[in-house]
Amino acid sequence: MSAVPHLPALRRGRPYESLEKTQVVNHRTGEVMAEVSQIGAGILRKDLRAIGEARAALKRFTVSELIAISAKAGEFFLNGELPLGDKGHTQTADQYVATLSSTSGLPHVMVRRNMTKIHYALTNLGTVINGLSRGLPLDVIDRGFGEQSGAAVSYYPTT
């Protein structure tokens, strides 16, 4: 295992180690904390041409299932030990706070507050979607059509 974690770019859900990388450094000492793969516009355009594959992969799940997965991810983010990159590293929530604080200069308390906000957003995604969609039933998003307040409605994703 490398001493410095490498965070790959994700291309259609798969890790991708790019030739173009940037280093994340400790803002005080200059020590390299991680290496991050980056992709350019050309690769992004190429991946967008295959957007149908990504949509098909997501279609295997209902919106309710995706909301439940997001809530579980929020709990892991706030309380778990998660994989960090593709070289076998892991990171606890406390290590995340220390690393983000040392690379950004943000005080630990602000990093923790932001973590709490991310956790809240992920664990309350159903409420967020309900507000953004003005109460559109989730099965309408799943099927593409349905009924809301006695009126026929349809839904079609644009990207």
Positions of predicted regions on the chain:
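N-terminal Rossmann-like NAD(P)+-binding subdomain of aldehyde/semialdehyde dehydrogenases
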Residues: M1-T159
